[in-house]
Amino acid sequence: MCAKLESEQIAGLLHVLLKPQLLMAIRVFLWLLSTRIGTLILGGRASLTTQFPFFQSFAYLSTDKQEDILRGWSLSTLGAFRAVYKLFKMITMWAVYTKIENGGFNRNWKAIGYCGADPQVIRSRKCSSNDGVRSNPLQDMVIATQAAGDKLEKVLSRAGVKVLNDDIPLKKLASGNRNRNNSAAGGDLGISCDVVVVGSGCGGGVIASVLAKAGYQVVILEKGKYFRTEDLTTLEGPSQMAMFEKLGSLATDDGGVNLVAGATVGGGTAINWSACFETPSHVLQEWKQISGLELFTSTRYKLAMKKIWHRLNVQPNIARENLQNSVLRAGCEKLSAEVGTLARNAPVDHDCGWCTYGCPSGQKGSTTSTWLKDAAESKNAVLLSECEAQRILFSKNHSGRKHYKARGVMAVVGSSKKRIFIEAQSVVVASGSLMTPPLLLNSGLRNPNIGKGLHLHPVVFMWGYFPEESGFPGTCYEGAIMTSYSPIYKKNGSFPVALLEVPSTHPGSFASFQPWTSAADFKERMRRFSRTVTLCAVTRDTSNGQVSVEADGKPKIDYTLNAVDEETILEGIEKGLRVLIAAGATEIGTHQQDGERFCVKGANSRDIEAYIKRVRSRGVKKNKIIIGSGHHMGSCKMGSDPRRSAVDGEGETWEVEGLYVSDGSVLPSAIGVNPMVTIQSVAYCIAHSVLQSLDSQYKSSTAKL
């Protein structure tokens, strides 16, 4: 029964995650496996048997032969086989280890040493009482549009939002866009405000706070749901499906890079790991040269960064380190390698290992507990959750600085067809580097730089097994997620090209990323889960990807590593393995699909060097190694020249006056460190540019009166 439920869950995930044409290809692939000839074509010699008719369909082959076929796909020279193998392996393992059964538990967790939901949260909720709970200002600001249903207009009116009852303003807003099919329809709703902000993460939260506190009426659109701290389950599977973009399974078009992005109120700040870095000075100098903008080396930017640091209450110290961070620090110290303590937007004693699924204590400085909270307290903002922006509305600008003038946004409520037209003086798009370009392109903007120059900070992983007697207490999933890091330099290099850090580790992600070579081998890997330390190397990439749109308007993300970045990634893998060895791992490995496990105990230096040479020789061929990304930058670059950038030095698009971009997409290149503080600092500068423009418009309109 459990296997049947898991297969149904996997089939459901495939329907949600795959594009129609790819889903059809997978159906054909599976149909072929259900036939003898098809299995022979796809499985080759491994599908042959010694008994008549000498070859069988996949389901009737022995387990050994099935495993041979799967291993063959994983290491195939044909990229299509590797991609299919990776797809099924990752989804299957994730489903098996995140499935919640009766009682909120999974039958595999006890065997692998995993406790499930955060025990501290469970205990605190059992002991707490709802009596006397004060109203949360953010909760009062959020309007769940899908839940409001037919009463949405009344709910908006009660919240102080100006509702447009006349169809004429709706038609004017719709006709302002160059695309078709935007005319008003029955059931549509129109509202008016000063500024509409698309997105509630790093960029959107800062923008909303600055403008609302200045007295302007702000409407924030967020396609994801809002979760109160008391609603957060900290269960891996349900949390990813509710809070992550595309259920946590977003990837580049060829499946080569797995992408993590937030799709909830708070955006990426709700699910990130709290790491705070100031923008490195050498990066700021580089950005000045690339963009032609003085902003990045100005006093204005330094003051903005200082403001962000203060508002996030960034703490430079920690009370204690967990298993993974302790191993990273100890290994670096034994190698005399540089190692530092990560500053975090959380208290020094905040050691929640589940913060990647929202922070139940509310202590992490996500936008929900900082900037959005400030906007809510101003009483000048509302946030419409489960409301996705589909078009920016603009019209010809006969007397302005640019050809077109922003007029508002057309959005859709949840899965319904109900549309909301928001009329505004200014529009700020802060949907992130992966989602901002499609919105601009679908709205009719034509600047050729929109979507180009995407950087992903590609991440690769290494693991080491540390038995209980190794001297490091705890498990891989408990304690503060990120507290230590080590910079990686090129030979004779002055600045880091990558960082060695540790990831959040829970069974579903661990199982989906670990190499699979056989059922028995994978069972052993999972049995060691709680004492397996995973390190990650985050590369400052020079590769350039692109975000474009499919014929149906959906995002298409293309990204290919260049030779320089491939070499940097291999440097990161090598350093991570050496750190694990130095810290005392008894066995180590990578996430290369060959799945080699190297036994450190008893190995001499020659054995170790031979192993590292083998790892390097395998390289980072697409879909032969797991590559992830949680930092997305540069797809709508800021600059002084419209021929080389998508927005100007104020964050305003070159084509449309009053339309701004304020997220990681405006960064001129990869930053090389966790980008939250940098994105918010740039957003703070852009927010004051928007504010200055609004003040100017307000003064102009009052002067005419």
Feature map (PLM): residue ranges:
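Extreme N-terminal leader/targeting segments of oxidoreductases
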Residues: M1-E8, G12-K19, A80-D194, Q692-L705
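Rossmann-like flavin
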Residues: T63-Q66, G72-L75, G79-K86, V96, ...
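N-terminal FAD cofactor-binding segment of flavoenzymes
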Residues: Y216-Q217, K223-H282, N325-E333
